[in-house]
């Protein structure tokens, strides 16, 4: 019977296993970092998209208020510059400065006004004694400023600035501008 001597250099050494594990660990750490970056960029994009939608919806609301005659052209103004002549109700105007963005339009039914955070209370009727200011209706991290400028007797510039969280812990601003004429008919008629 013949005995064969095993080659001592066959197989994997402990050193090779440790090196392979080290390379794999570095690769997995890099993958984890890239996933974190992807989530941050995704949040940033989502917040920017939401901000654009908020700004555009407010600009479109101004045209709808005029077209449906819920407000007259003179009433679409900041507080202190409202002309209630010929209106069916007195409107106080859109507040100046940055204010919370609410999920509720408040008792006047118009987003962007000073009453947006008013909760009707337990009776669910506005204007009763149980109404209260409900800050939970504000969209966390978001605020807006509405500036309405009269360019002529028949033309207004509406500028909406929205402050929003960018997903990286910073607050950014998005500015949207539109022009509103004193003609409730659609431009294509």
Spans of model-derived segments:
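Low-complexity, Gly/Pro-rich coil/beta segments used as flexible assembly/activation regions
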Residues: 49, 53-189
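N-terminal leader/signal peptides at the extreme start of proteins
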Residues: 1-12
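Exposed boundary/loop context
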Residues: 4, 20-23, 171
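Aliphatic-rich helix starts adjacent to a transmembrane/signal segment
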Residues: 10-56
